[in-house]
Design a protein with these regions (language model features):
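A short, structure-level motif marking secondary-structure boundaries and short turns
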Residues: 36-37, 122-125, 168
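Conserved non-catalytic scaffold segment of RNase H-like nuclease domains
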Residues: 1-100, 108-114, 138-145, 152
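Short, glycine/acidic-enriched loop or turn micro-motifs at the edges of active sites
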Residues: 10-12, 122, 160
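Short hydrophobic helices that act as membrane-entry/anchoring signals
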Residues: 178-211
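Acidic, Mg2+-coordinating catalytic module of metal-dependent nucleases/exonucleases
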Residues: 86-93, 97-103, 132, 136-189
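Conserved protein kinase catalytic core
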Residues: 13-15, 125, 163
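Short alpha-helix plus adjacent loop in nuclease-associated cores
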Residues: 117-133
């Protein structure tokens, strides 16, 4: 079995009205090792429909998308990349809607590649739910795990989703024990974080005034 961990950035939240402006997919073998990667920028055809906040978050600008592909060029690349793979995404329903909208808008009929995917939100709920995590966004999970801040760029977020997928899949007793250890470490780190500056200040004072 092969997987494609993926993320999309869009001009808003409504598939079939807003548009996908970037896609990243990381293809994995059965051992969850990366074997290929696809990063595509897509030129929006109906920018007047775009949500300004969505464009701000994903960093869209005409100059940064000057080399973007037209939807007719991007769709076959994405379709071929995903073929015979199980999709993996953080909120798969959202990404699936925009990929399907792109395929249908460009007249593609090979929609069977959009098979049922694996949602890392569901995996996260199963793994972190018992520990009272209040949000299952990539940003919240990454913050708890001490990962770099989410950038809302397709490739960066796909890399983060891939790391989360490797951490949580497949769910097993071994994985559960690993998660328990990670959450415990995160809680300890969270308790200590507010005191780091104070400890650094005390250490500096000690070095300057207490040592002989």
């Amino acid at each position: 079995m092969k997987f494609v961990v993926l993320d999309t950035e869009t001009t808003g939240l409504r598939a079939y009205y807003h548009e996908m402006v970037s896609f990243c997919g990381i293809k994995l073998d059965q051992d969850l090792r990366e074997i290929d990667r696809l990063v595509v920028k897509i030129r929006p055809l109906h920018l007047q429909r775009a949500d300004s906040e969505a464009l701000r978050i994903n960093g869209y600008s005409p100059s940064r998308w000057a080399d973007a592909m037209d939807p007719d060029e991007a769709a076959p690349l994405i379709a071929e990349f995903m073929r015979d793979c199980t999709p993996v995404a953080h909120n798969w329903a959202f990404d699936r809607g925009f990929i399907l909208a792109l395929f249908k808008a460009t007249g593609r009929t090979d929609l069977r590649i959009m098979r049922r995917g694996i949602d890392t939100i569901a995996l996260s709920i199963a793994a972190f739910g018992p520990y009272g995590l209040k949000s299952y966004s990539l940003e919240s999970i990454g913050s708890m795990l001490g990962w770099p801040k989410q950038k809302h760029r397709a490739e960066a977020d796909t890399v983060m989703c891939y790391a989360l997928f490797r951490l949580l899949y497949p769910m097993s007793i071994k994985t559960a024990i690993k998660i328990q250890s990670i959450v415990l470490y995160a809680k300890i780190r969270g308790i200590l974080n507010p005191y780091r500056a104070m400890l650094a200040l005390l250490l500096s004072f000690w070095c300057q005034h207490v040592q002989p």
